């Protein structure tokens, strides 16, 4: 709440009245920055805001401190028109560019028809409408987004007006007619006749009917077919044959128009290929008599997913996860801290999100409205990992580099693996030190941004994803398709090479399997002026730049080499057929080739004879007098296009078996030659050797300057050394492509319902000509005609070295000049959308509106679909008031600072704004406006003029109402797809809804597919040292994905209670659905439960009841806990080690709860990847304390970090001697210590919601917060409540009383009856109804004692229900009181009810603190009648807390914890494997397999490992007598031995009033602290 007017200091009025008498500086400062004295009065300040849960229940110190704690524990304290748009993207003739009335009329007619068809389909489907991606004059068919399995029915083929029942009764003739109607809505009689008699068609149509096969696919060693039946013509019915004919005719018509093919052209065939550029792109190649055609459907953006339609006025919070490609913590040097000016070894961590068009940098993952940096990827040139050899100032790890030689020596391997270990272990606080890790850079037109990643795997992942996004933005048209046409007359030469040879050891393994081939087509770049050809000025500039570069590399090149380009196509199948067909085409076109060669030679002569700029002029009309096909391409031609080829060029050279055809050879009559040679032209084939001779893990080859100058790709000969290799290298990766066939009818819909003449309009022609990056970029209409190039981008070389146009001084001068006129602008209100004729704020100058809109789009990295509504000048209240400009867009409220040196920016989606209202300003001179944001603090703005504030309020409310009315029917462009937690308005789902929508499941599955693809890329890189970003096609015929060729054997190892095992069952079921084998190894008590879910079971030692009793008794980490654990569980630990080792035999991947303590050692012995997963903080961080050492009051980041070090040290001291003995005797491994275990580097999965446990920015890349792993056992559906319970709840509702749940599980307390009495009294005083689950008991309880003392009688306001399924009960009540376990806390949050937590032990203290911090509940430090009564009243009546709990529930229901965990497993699998390989290499290097010796390692006390700790370890002292471990006497805390136990001494602790649960003795509430100086 803002301060009242009467609280404003009178000095403020005086300051305002005397403003005109002050100097210019005072007038300026008073207008820019309001007086700051209000900061101490404004309760809305973050420092003064009342913390949720910090209510009377906790503020009354006497209530909780003076009274007895009754509960004191014992001893404790798709789109249908995508391909169609591609087909007719270029069908209009150049003469039609100006447009005409007929074409515009046809466009309007077809647009209306398409709208009717689309609305008809939406009404038929009766399903939620998918969001549409940004599109330019094309539409998306919702049916494509449906699950593949759901589309395998005949309903897709039914006419628009028929339902399923009617369609199923149609006779064959009617069904044929429906097929015709579906494919040809205009009932083209000529096409129907042509389908019946193909001889009536043109040559091209007849050839397509004969040779086009849309489902052409064959199984290979690297491509597996799933559920695909390849039928022959004999097996097809007449209906199927007719459908194929109509479909092929439709394709022929579109191919002819989009590629400008002649009727006399002949279609030879279509083939599946991979285009090799900076990505490996899956696609198709068409061969005709006159051209080589390539096209592909790029993957659709996944922000097409939306929630279901809701009722008017409601809403549903839906974040922008559909638009997020990757997110995580990265280091970055920013000007904010002087990092870009001063070279330091430090960096600062930020939260970075990669989206479809931007990279956005935030301070933390919880503050996504105020970005620090926005990088527009539409202006991005390239992204790459920085190698130390290329940039010595980047400070990457010096130890991770590739040797100059290709062969790997054992000595180099030893140094590399050893250094990799040591570098990883040097990090103590990862938030600042960047001596390890890797840098990568993102180069844009204006600036180069550098980011620091913790591992090379993470850096590669970021770079690969950025490269894929940039490729799609720069190399596709607005319809998300890649198109290329190479006229045969422009082809200079082509050759076919084998990618892999036949190695000696595998020469017979493949039998008759066809080997992959690469087709290299060399053609004259921009040789023909086509639809996508460059303009004269751009062609001249690009040819000049590229020729200069090539001349520097190879001064002896011929002119045709300088003007040529190479395109590489990888064919896993049909390589020989493609080559022979291309030979046949060339032979048939030899006459055209001669004509072309004459023209080409004339160009060469001009180049060699002329000086100046005329030599590279574009072709003139005189050149066009000869009829030749026109070149078409959406691909860029920059010099970074073939980075994969460049990588392969760096590999060692060898001879290859090459088929080569050089069209420019003078040895034949028509300039053609067909030969079989040993040319090394195939750079792709060099990929083979790297697979058979892998480079070192993480290696990056250091090259000398001479090596860096790679040979020109146009050269055809060079001396090489050959090594033959079969496919076994790729097979050993155990990954393969899997293709599943889509429904034929769904494929047909991609070619139907067309807008025949839509591309004839000038606007559509321009949009289809531009790349997606330019099509989505902010633009202003210009009277000059735009160049016809596909990108309209400057050549990268022209802006790479550009310096800033304005110096720092000039920019400051401009800022001061702007500020001098700021008072005249304070009252400026601008409307860019006219409200009515009397709108005085509306800017009527069209050009001015366009300029302002473009600036708005550019400053916030929006695309050109975002519209500006209004703008204002105001102050936004943050830590200090910041003056700037507010922009109201159609879907966002944005702000940018106008103060020099202040870079505050805000992008707030309107979808997250509940409402806004007027408030009084900080003083009389200002008028306030407050924005109420869901799940966020209120945002305050202050205006110097009241009329501006009132207009801003009215416009925001108007836009909110407009968005609510539009609801889900608004296009995706009106939703916030770029920033923040955006979504769509609809009715809030009730808290009882716990199921996830199918769209969210699809999104999670899509992310898993990308994770598998990333795993495959990692495997290729580890095996070959090549960075190969792979882009899979979104084909209408097949769905291609990467899958492991064999099932992995997962072992999930955990100990503890039922709550510890349940998440692993949920994860195991998810892995089973992925096709893997899963075994859970845990206590025998849970065997029946686990096997019942279809998961294999293996038993390990331990009694969960005893473990729980120990934890409850001691509450948290303490000296008494360590003593009792050592005395009682030493024998159990040995059994745990032995049984766990036995249970993990045969595993491929081990996932372990770190409480089991054995996973790292077993994985090292088995040589398998190892991943940790847990429900509480276990990673070193400054954000959260260790779950077992939670202080009563927050002590800051340094304390939090040291708690993790303390716990790691204490736990290792307790088990180190037994573990080391077990390693030597059972595992055959050497002794280890905490330093070499490097637990910090192990991949970690937190099965906690990121809403409750937001990932910290100092988490390393391999730590993932996935969300809760909920196990849906159907208990809510199967549970039958008793009649008494139903009546009790109905009566409470009838009496208008709140219903709460109270249950603490089976805890043991000092006095159970007193606890029951306190609960009864609290419930009665709070006037609520209680469902009680009484499971607690006395420490000294016995049957005789229980009979002697009567049980507490429960009043009618309390119903003792016993155990009830949480997922059934919690959605039906108003609040819950429990002990704070991870599972119970997640259940209450998912149900959306406020939670009261009374922690007893372990992580319960952490969750109590977190629930209170996020404002969704209350944490009770002491439980008694008074405190519980106050908490119950607050939880059932605090509207803010209730609303917060509901909002958290909405977010939790959108999470897919299990699927997110599977995605993370795939992402981190190769990194986890590399850690184990490094450890094994270290053991091998020191010959430590027998465990007889251990290398000397200097380590500090926190890692010190002493064998004297174990009295039973005398036999080991002799073998280790010669080994010495140095101790550092300057540690932060000391370790003292007392009865073989460890006491932690922390000198930084203050007085005993600050209770710290770290070493209290049983029954003592005060912390025992030893003076560190003694």
Curated annotation (Swiss-Prot):
Subcellular location(s) of the protein: Cytoplasm; Membrane
Family the entry assigns: Belongs to the glycosyltransferase 28 family.
Organism, scientific name: Debaryomyces hansenii (strain ATCC 36239 / CBS 767 / BCRC 21394 / JCM 1990 / NBRC 0083 / IGC 2968)
GO biological process, one term: carbohydrate metabolic process
Catalytic activity line of the entry: a sterol + UDP-alpha-D-glucose = a sterol 3-beta-D-glucoside + UDP + H(+); ergosterol + UDP-alpha-D-glucose = ergosteryl 3-beta-D-glucoside + UDP + H(+)
InterPro entries referenced in this protein's UniProt entry, alphabetically: ATG26_PH_GRAM2 (IPR048065), EryCIII-like_C (IPR010610), Glycosyltransferase_28 (IPR050426), GlycoTrans_28_N (IPR004276), GRAM (IPR004182), PH-like_dom_sf (IPR011993), PH_domain (IPR001849), UDP_glucos_trans (IPR002213)
Protein's recorded name: Sterol 3-beta-glucosyltransferase
Region listing for Disordered, in residue ranges: 37-61, 102-170, 389-413, 538-559, 651-722, 774-806, 964-996, 1505-1574
A matching Pfam family: EryCIII-like_C
Name of the top EC class for this enzyme: transferase
Topological relation to the membrane, as annotated: Peripheral membrane protein
Annotated GO CC locations: cytoplasm; membrane
Acidic residues: compositionally biased ranges: 139-148
Its job: Sterol glycosyltransferase responsible for the glycosylation of ergosterol to form ergosterol-glucoside.
Polar residues bias spans: 37-48, 692-701, 712-722, 985-996, 1563-1574
Gene: ATG26
Domain GRAM, residue spans: 253-288, 854-920
Entries under PROSITE patterns matching the protein: PH_DOMAIN
Keywords associated with the record: Cytoplasm, Glycosyltransferase, Lipid biosynthesis, Lipid metabolism, Membrane, Repeat, Steroid biosynthesis, Steroid metabolism, Sterol biosynthesis, Sterol metabolism, Transferase
Record-listed E.C. numbers: 2.4.1.-, 2.4.1.173
Binding site for UDP-alpha-D-glucose: 1057-1058, 1060, 1333, 1364, 1366, 1379, 1382-1384, 1403-1404
Compositionally skewed regions (Basic and acidic residues) per UniProt: 107-121, 128-138, 149-170, 702-711, 964-976, 1510-1533
An example molecular function term from Gene Ontology annotations: sterol 3-beta-glucosyltransferase activity
Highest rank taxon of the organism: Eukaryota
SMART domains, A to Z: GRAM, PH
Segments forming domain PH: 323-471
């Amino acid at each position: 709440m803002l301060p009242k007017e009467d609280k404003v200091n009178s000095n403020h009025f005086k300051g305002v009245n005397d403003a005109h008498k002050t100097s210019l500086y005072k007038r300026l400062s008073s207008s820019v920055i309001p007086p700051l004295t209000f900061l101490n009065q404004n309760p809305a300040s973050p420092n003064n805001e009342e913390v949720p849960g910090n209510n009377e229940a906790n503020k009354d110190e006497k209530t909780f401190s003076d009274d007895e704690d009754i509960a004191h524990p014992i001893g404790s304290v798709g789109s249908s028109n995508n391909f169609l748009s591609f087909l007719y993207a270029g069908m209009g003739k150049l003469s039609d560019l100006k447009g005409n009335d007929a074409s515009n009329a046809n466009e309007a007619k077809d647009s209306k028809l398409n709208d009717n068809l689309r609305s008809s389909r939406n009404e038929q489907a009766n399903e939620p409408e998918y969001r549409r991606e940004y599109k330019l004059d094309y539409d998306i068919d919702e049916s494509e987004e449906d699950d593949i399995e759901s589309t395998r029915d005949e309903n897709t083929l039914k006419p628009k007006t028929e339902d399923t029942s009617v369609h199923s009764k149609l006779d064959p003739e009617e069904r044929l007619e429906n097929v015709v109607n579906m494919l040809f809505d205009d009932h083209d009689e000529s096409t129907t006749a042509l389908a019946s008699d193909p001889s009536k068609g043109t040559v091209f149509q007849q050839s397509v009917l004969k040779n086009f096969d849309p489902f052409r696919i064959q199984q290979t060693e690297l491509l597996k077919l799933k559920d695909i039946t390849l039928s022959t013509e004999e097996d097809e019915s007449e209906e199927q044959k007719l459908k194929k004919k109509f479909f092929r005719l439709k394709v022929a018509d579109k191919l002819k128009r989009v590629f400008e093919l002649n009727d006399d052209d002949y279609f030879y065939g279509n083939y599946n290929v991979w285009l090799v550029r900076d990505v490996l792109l899956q696609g198709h190649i068409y061969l005709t008599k006159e051209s080589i055609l390539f096209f592909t459907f790029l993957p659709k953006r996944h922000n097409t997913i939306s929630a279901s339609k809701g009722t008017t006025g409601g809403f549903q919070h839906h974040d922008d996860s559909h638009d997020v490609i990757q997110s995580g913590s990265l280091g970055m040097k920013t000007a904010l801290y002087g990092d870009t000016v001063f070279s330091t070894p430090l960096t600062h961590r930020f939260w970075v999100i990669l989206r479809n068009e931007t990279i956005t940098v935030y301070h933390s993952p919880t503050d996504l409205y105020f970005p620090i940096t926005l990088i527009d990827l539409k202006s991005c040139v390239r992204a790459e990992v920085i190698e130390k050899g290329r940039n010595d100032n980047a400070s990457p790890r010096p130890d991770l580099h590739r040797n100059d030689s290709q062969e790997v020596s054992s000595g180099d391997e030893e140094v590399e693996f050893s250094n990799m270990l040591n570098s990883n272990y040097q990090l103590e606080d990862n938030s600042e030190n960047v001596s390890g890790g890797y840098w990568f850079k993102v180069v844009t037109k204006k600036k180069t941004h550098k980011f620091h990643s913790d591992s090379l795997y993470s850096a590669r992942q970021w770079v690969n994803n950025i490269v894929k996004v940039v490729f799609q933005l720069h190399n596709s048209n607005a319809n998300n398709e890649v198109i290329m046409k190479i006229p045969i007359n422009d082809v200079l030469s082509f050759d076919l090479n084998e990618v892999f040879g036949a190695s000696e050891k595998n020469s017979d393994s493949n039998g008759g399997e066809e080997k992959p081939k690469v087709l290299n087509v060399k053609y004259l770049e921009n040789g023909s002026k086509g639809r996508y050809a460059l303009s004269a000025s751009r062609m001249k500039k690009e040819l000049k730049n590229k020729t200069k570069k090539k001349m520097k590399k190879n001064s002896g090149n011929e002119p045709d080499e300088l003007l040529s380009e190479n395109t590489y196509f990888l064919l896993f199948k049909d390589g020989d057929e493609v080559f022979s067909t291309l030979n046949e085409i060339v032979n048939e076109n030899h006459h055209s080739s001669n004509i072309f060669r004459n023209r080409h030679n004339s160009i060469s002569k001009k180049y060699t004879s002329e000086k100046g700029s005329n030599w590279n002029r574009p072709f003139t009309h005189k050149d066009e007098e000869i009829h030749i096909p026109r070149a078409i391409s959406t691909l860029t031609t920059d010099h970074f296009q073939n980075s994969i080829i460049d990588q392969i060029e760096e590999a060692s050279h060898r001879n290859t078996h090459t088929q080569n055809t050089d069209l420019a050879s003078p040895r034949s009559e028509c300039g053609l030659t067909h030969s079989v040679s040993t040319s090394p032209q195939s750079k792709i084939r060099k990929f083979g050797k790297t697979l058979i001779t892998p480079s070192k893990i993480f290696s990056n080859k250091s090259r000398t300057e001479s090596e860096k100058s790679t040979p020109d790709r146009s050269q055809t000969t060079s001396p090489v050394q050959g090594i033959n290799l079969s496919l076994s290298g790729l097979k050993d990766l155990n990954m393969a492509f899997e293709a599943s066939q889509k429904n034929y009818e769904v494929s047909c819909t991609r070619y139907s319902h067309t807008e025949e003449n839509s591309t004839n309009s000038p606007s559509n022609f321009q949009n289809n000509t531009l790349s997606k990056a330019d099509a989505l970029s902010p633009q202003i209409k210009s009277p000059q005609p735009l160049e016809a190039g596909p990108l309209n981008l400057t050549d990268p070389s022209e802006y790479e070295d550009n310096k800033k146009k304005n110096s720092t001084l000039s920019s400051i001068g401009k800022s001061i000049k702007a500020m001098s006129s700021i008072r005249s602008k304070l009252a400026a209100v601008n409307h860019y959308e006219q409200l009515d004729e009397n709108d005085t704020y509306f800017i009527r100058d069209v050009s001015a509106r366009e300029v302002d809109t473009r600036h708005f789009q550019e400053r916030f990295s929006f695309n050109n679909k975002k519209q500006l509504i209004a703008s204002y000048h105001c102050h936004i209240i943050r830590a200090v008031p910041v003056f700037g400009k507010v922009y109201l867009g159609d879907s966002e409220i944005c702000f940018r600072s106008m103060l020099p040196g202040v870079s505050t920016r805000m992008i707030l989606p309107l979808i997250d704004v509940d409402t806004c209202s007027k408030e009084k300003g900080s003083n009389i001179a200002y008028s306030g406006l407050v924005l109420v944001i869901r799940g966020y603090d209120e945002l305050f703005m202050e205006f110097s003029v009241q009329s501006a504030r009132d207009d801003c309020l009215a416009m925001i409310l108007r836009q909110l109402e407009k968005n609510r009315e539009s609801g889900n029917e608004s296009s995706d462009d009106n939703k916030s797809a770029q920033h923040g937690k955006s979504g769509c308005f609809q009715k809030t789902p009730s808290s009882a809804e716990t199921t996830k929508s199918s769209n969210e499941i699809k999104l999670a599955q899509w992310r898993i597919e990308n994770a598998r693809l990333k795993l495959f890329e990692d495997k290729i890189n580890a095996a070959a040292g090549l960075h190969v970003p792979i882009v899979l096609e979104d084909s209408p015929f097949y769905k291609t994905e990467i899958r492991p060729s064999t099932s992995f054997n997962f072992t999930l190892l955990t100990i503890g209670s039922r709550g510890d095992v349940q998440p692993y069952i949920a994860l195991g079921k998810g892995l089973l659905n992925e096709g893997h084998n899963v075994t859970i190894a845990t206590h025998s008590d849970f065997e029946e439960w686990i096997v019942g879910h279809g998961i294999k079971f293996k038993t390990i030692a331990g009694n969960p009841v005893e473990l729980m009793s120990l934890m409850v008794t001691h509450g948290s980490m303490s000296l008494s806990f360590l003593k009792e654990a050592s005395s009682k569980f030493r024998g159990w630990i040995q059994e745990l080690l032995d049984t766990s080792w036995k249970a993990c035999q045969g595993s491929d991947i081990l996932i372990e709860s770190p409480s089991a303590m054995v996973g790292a050692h077993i994985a090292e012995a088995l040589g398998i990847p190892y991943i940790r997963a847990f429900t509480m903080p276990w990673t070193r961080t400054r954000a959260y304390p260790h779950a077992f050492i939670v202080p009563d009051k927050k002590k800051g980041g340094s304390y939090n970090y040291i708690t993790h070090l303390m716990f790691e040290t204490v736990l290792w001291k307790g088990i180190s001697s037994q573990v080391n003995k077990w390693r030597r005797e059972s595992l055959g491994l050497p002794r280890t210590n905490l330093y070499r275990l490097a637990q910090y580097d192990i991949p970690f999965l937190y099965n906690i919601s990121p809403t409750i446990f937001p990932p910290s920015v100092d988490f390393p890349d391999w730590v993932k917060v996935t969300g809760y792993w909920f196990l849906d056992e159907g208990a809510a559906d199967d549970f039958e409540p008793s009649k008494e319970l139903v009546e009790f709840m109905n009566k409470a509702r009838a009496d208008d009383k709140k219903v709460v749940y109270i249950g603490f599980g089976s805890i043991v307390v000092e006095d159970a009856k007193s606890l029951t009495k306190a609960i009864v009294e609290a419930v009665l005083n709070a006037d609520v109804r209680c469902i009680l689950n009484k499971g607690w008991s006395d420490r000294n309880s016995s049957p005789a004692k229980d009979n002697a003392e009567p049980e507490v009688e429960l009043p009618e306001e309390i119903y003792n229900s016993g155990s009830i399924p949480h997922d059934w009960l919690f959605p039906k009540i108003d609040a819950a009181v429990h002990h704070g376990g991870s599972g119970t806390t997640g259940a209450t949050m998912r149900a959306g009810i406020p939670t009261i937590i009374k922690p007893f032990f372990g992580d319960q203290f952490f969750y109590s603190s977190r629930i209170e911090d996020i404002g969704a509940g209350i944490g009770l430090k002491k439980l008694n009648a008074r405190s519980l009564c106050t908490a119950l009243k607050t939880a059932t009546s605090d509207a803010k807390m209730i609303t917060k709990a509901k909002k958290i529930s909405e977010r939790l229901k959108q999470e897919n914890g299990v699927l997110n965990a599977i995605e993370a497993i795939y992402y981190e699998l190769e990194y986890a494997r590399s850690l184990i390989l490094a450890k094994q290499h270290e053991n091998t290097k020191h010959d430590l397999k027998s465990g007889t010796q251990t290398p000397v390692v200097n380590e500090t006390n926190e890692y010190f490992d002493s064998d004297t700790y174990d009295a039973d370890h005398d036999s080991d002292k002799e073998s280790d007598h010669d080994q010495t471990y140095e101790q550092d006497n300057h540690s932060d805390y000391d370790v003292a031995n007392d009865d073989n136990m460890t006491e932690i001494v922390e000198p930084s602790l203050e007085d005993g009033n600050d209770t710290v649960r770290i070493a209290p003795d049983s029954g003592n509430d005060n912390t025992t602290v030893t003076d560190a100086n003694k």
